[in-house]
Structures are given as C-alpha cells and as structure tokens.
C-alpha cells in the first residue's frame, strides 16, 4: 500500500511539473496536501479535516463558522451565513437561526432559508431527490442532535433538536451549503455538480481532476469583503508521500506543503524555506475496540499500553514537532481538569499491570491495529506507529498492522469495530479534532452513537459517561458546562480510554514568496489574506 501511494505521489508531482495550467503566475499559490486524492467538491468533503480545510471552508460556508483571524488564541465560533442564533427560553430544543441577507451562490442564485432546509435534506432525508449518499456519509454523523427543521421566512430557519443540546452550533459549523439551483442546472446529478460546483465561499472551484489537482479563483462578490482573496488562483495537489511533497517544494513545483517530514525541516530552513507551526486542537491516538473479546476491555491493559510509550523518544524522532500527550486533550487545555493517572514512560509498571491481567513472557498479548500511510492530521503514521509498536513489544504487547489508505480508514471508522471491514483489529490509529465538546468528546464514546448511528467506533458504552455527556448537552451556562467537561476528561485519562500519544503542531513548509498567512489554532485556515511575491 505504501509503495502504491508513493508511486501515485510521484506521478502527481510529475503531472504538476508538466502542467501548463500550474505554471508559475502572479498570485498563484500551489499547495501539496497529505491527502491521496482531491476531496469531494460538492460541499460535504471527505478526506477528514484536510478535506474541509481545502475544499470545504474555501468554496463553501456554514451557518456557523470558526474565527481563523488570529494565531495567538484558540478559535471560537462566529457568525457565518447566520448572523445570529438563539435557543428558545421556554423550549430548549428549539433554535432560531437568523440568516445573512443578500448572499448569493457562485451561480448567482440567492441563499435563503429554503437553501438551508434543502441542504439538510441532502444529508438527512433519504427520500429527498437531492439526497447524496456520499455527502451524507460525511455530514450526517456531524449533526446527530437534529430532529427537524423548517424555513420560517426567507431569512429565518428553525431547527429542533431531539433533546436540549447546547452543542448544536458546533455541530452546525460542519454543514456546508451547496446551491440548489446549480444542482438543478447540472441535471440533478451530484457527479455533474462535482465538476461544476457552486457554494457561497470566498473561493470558486474552477477545475477538478481526480488524484491530480483542484483549482480555485477568488469570489469577488463574497459577502465578507475582508475575506475576498488577494491571490489570483489557489491550486491544491494530492501528495501523500512526505518525500514527494518535499521534492515538489524544493523543485518549485509547489509553494507550500502540509506536514513536512521532520528530518527535512533543518535542511529546508537552511535552504530559505519557512517552517510555520502552532498549537491546535489535535490528538494522535489509538482508538481502542471495546467489543466482546477485545483485550482493551481490561483497564490494566489500557494503562499498561499508555505507560509503555516513550513520548519524549517520539518527540526526538519527530525533531521536536509534537507536544507529548498528558491526556486526551493537550496540556493546559481549559477542560483538562485534574486526572490522577499520569502518562509517563514506565515500562516496569506496564509489565506489572500486564502480569496482573494474565499476560507475560510465555503469554504475550497479541493484537492487530488498523493504520494509514498518510492522511489529514495523521502526521507521519508509518514511522510513528512503528515506534509505538516497538515500545509495546518491549513490555509484552505484540502488535501487527493492517495498513489501509486514509479514506478507507475513515470508512472503516464509520462502520465500527464490529463490521467485517475492521478485519479483526482491536484498535485503529486515528487523529481527532478536539475543539468543541461534541467532536472532542461526545461522538467518540456516547452509547447511542455507536455505528451506524454515529462514530463511536469501539462500541464503548458507560452509563456514567453518558450521564456526563447529557449534562454537557443540557447545560447552557458556560462555566457550569466547563466543570462537567473537566470531569469527562478526567475520566478519559484515569480510565485510559484511548492510547494517548501526542499532539501535532500543524507544521507547514512554504516558499519565502508566500506572504500574509496567519496560522490559526484550528484544523481549518484562512487563505484569503495570502499573497505571493
């Protein structure tokens, strides 16, 4: 698999070098992604957070968006296509979203409350003519709170949740708005829309070639004039293999690469390239299966695995481009709380716990883990997982890997540990977006969000944890909600619910010609301020 991806990466780099449309031009920025293919262009992207970064929040908008203007503070949600939202004081399941007037899709049609309803239908209503299984697979699990919705007037939408849920605005931030009129124009075919998409975002997608490139140009009529792009063109190219990305940057075939290989950072700096990093809400974990027969059902085994990891050694492997995990959340996070289990490197304590669980030199724990060779937020999964594998072997846990492409891993994650696609694996290396209560905590472990209802891949179920999740959803006071979130994180750590290894620093390498980029503490980024010398 890794060899095939390398061949595809080198082919993409060759196509990039020979393509006349990608020739250097004034104001053209070319970015090498870690994804192995161009993300879906129809609104709800695939390829994880990277898909949303490059083909979601560029060409599309949501009702609620993230403030990406600052590198110095964590992002917060801000008005997008909705100017305001509020929960009904008498009925905490009823939300009203007031929409921004005068917004148009790229095809010139109006954005209205009917557009919002139409887009929710494309994800949630299998009987709707515009229902798209591919987009639904990406978006449905993002909005599990939604029970119903309606247009109240052209600029007002009402959304009703299944139960009171204070996390709804964070869920809605994932839902991109595609043009209903464009879908009609394209013969009611999402395949046709993919080639000629229409959103309301600051960028317009003008070219799309699978596994080769996507091109975007500014939307001069964008509703937020401060975010009208300054570039002439933005081009994204899939280059999943780190050495191919680095080679493309050094040769001038791209101007910017995501996630440079750590062992190239010093030489890239000495060659005049910029290395940009920042903390962001990310973790690099193994999500552990809790189905019957999984060795991870024993807390002693989970704690032993966490104590086996030499996180400082991994930091050295990555040339310092990581933050060693002290929990599921990064150190200093406002929801960190005071967990009592410390994620230190203590192989002897790990061996003792494994012995208590019935394992030893004559009876090693043997298991299989799903991993990918690349992918959004996955950092450098092959050498990192091999490092973890070695650490675990030293205490008596023998791990074999099933290597699958990133998008395939996402599909396995959505299918769940009980599905045949998991191939008997008891865990998967999966990185998580942890910048809000729902995507950071609830979706991973709530009982009723096990597949196919949601993305609780491991089928974990604990009524005590569910009670805490319910408290978060029903608590609309931020200070009170924070106390509950701290308790949740303490439980995540003290019960070692994941193998918690590291947090990324979101490294990017770019040409000195790239100016004006502000790296937000977020999975998503604003490219509108960027210029090229």
Give a label for each model feature.
Residues 98, 135-183, 207:
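Surface-exposed binding/hinge segments that line
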Residues 66-67, 217-221, 280-304, 504:
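A bilobed periplasmic-binding-protein/Venus flytrap-type ligand-binding module shared by bacterial periplasmic
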Residues 67-72, 173-229, 235, 241, ...:
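Gly/Pro-rich hinge or "lid" segments in bacterial periplasmic/extracellular proteins
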């Amino acid at each position: 698999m890794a060899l095939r991806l390398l061949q595809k990466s080198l082919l993409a780099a060759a196509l990039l070098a020979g393509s006349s449309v990608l020739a250097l031009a004034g104001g053209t920025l070319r970015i090498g992604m870690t994804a192995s293919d161009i993300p879906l262009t129809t609104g709800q992207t695939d390829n994880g957070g990277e898909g949303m970064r490059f083909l979601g929040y560029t060409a599309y908008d949501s009702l609620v968006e993230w403030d990406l203007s600052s590198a110095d503070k964590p992002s917060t949600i801000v008005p997008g296509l909705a100017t305001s939202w509020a929960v009904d004081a008498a009925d905490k399941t009823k939300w009203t979203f007031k929409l921004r007037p005068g917004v148009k899709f790229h095809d010139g049609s109006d954005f209205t409350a009917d557009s919002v309803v139409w887009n929710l239908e494309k994800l949630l209503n299998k009987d709707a003519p515009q229902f798209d299984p591919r987009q639904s697979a990406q978006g449905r699990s993002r909005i599990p709170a939604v029970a119903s919705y309606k247009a109240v007037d052209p600029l007002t939408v009402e959304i009703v949740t299944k139960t009171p849920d204070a996390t709804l605005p964070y869920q809605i931030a994932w839902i991109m708005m595609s043009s209903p009129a464009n879908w009609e124009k394209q013969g009611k075919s999402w395949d046709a829309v993919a080639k000629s998409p229409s959103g309301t975002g600051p960028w317009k997608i003008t070219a799309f070639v699978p596994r080769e490139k996507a091109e975007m140009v500014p939307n001069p009529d964008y509703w937020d004039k401060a975010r009208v792009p300054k570039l002439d063109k933005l081009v994204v190219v899939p280059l999943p293999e780190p050495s191919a990305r680095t080679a493309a940057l050094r040769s001038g075939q791209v101007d910017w690469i995501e996630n440079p290989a750590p062992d190239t950072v010093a030489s890239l700096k000495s060659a005049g390239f910029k290395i940009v990093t920042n903390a962001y809400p990310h973790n690099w974990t193994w999500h552990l299966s809790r189905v019957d027969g999984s060795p991870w059902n024993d807390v002693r085994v989970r704690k032993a695995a966490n104590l086996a990891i030499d996180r400082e050694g991994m930091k050295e492997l990555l040339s310092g481009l990581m933050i060693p995990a002290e929990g599921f959340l990064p150190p200093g996070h406002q929801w960190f709380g005071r967990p009592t289990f410390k994620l230190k490197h203590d192989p002897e304590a790990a061996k003792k716990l494994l012995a208590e669980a019935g394992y030893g030199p004559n009876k090693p724990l043997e298991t299989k883990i799903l991993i990918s060779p690349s992918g959004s937020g996955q950092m450098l999964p092959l050498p990192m997982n091999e490092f973890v594998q070695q650490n675990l072997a030293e205490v008596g846990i023998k791990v074999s890997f099933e290597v699958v492409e990133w998008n395939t891993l996402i599909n396995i994650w959505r299918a769940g540990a009980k599905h045949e696609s998991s191939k008997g694996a008891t865990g998967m290396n999966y990185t998580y977006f942890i910048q809000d209560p729902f995507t950071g905590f609830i979706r991973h472990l709530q009982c009723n969000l096990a597949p196919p209802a949601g993305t609780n891949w491991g089928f974990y179920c604990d009524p005590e944890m569910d009670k805490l999740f319910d408290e978060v959803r029903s608590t609309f006071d931020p200070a009170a909600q924070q106390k509950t979130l701290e308790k949740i994180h303490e439980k995540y750590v003290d019960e070692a619910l994941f193998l918690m290894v590291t947090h990324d620093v979101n490294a990017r390498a770019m040409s000195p010609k790239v100016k004006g980029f502000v790296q937000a503490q977020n999975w998503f980024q604003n490219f509108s301020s960027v210029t090229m010398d």
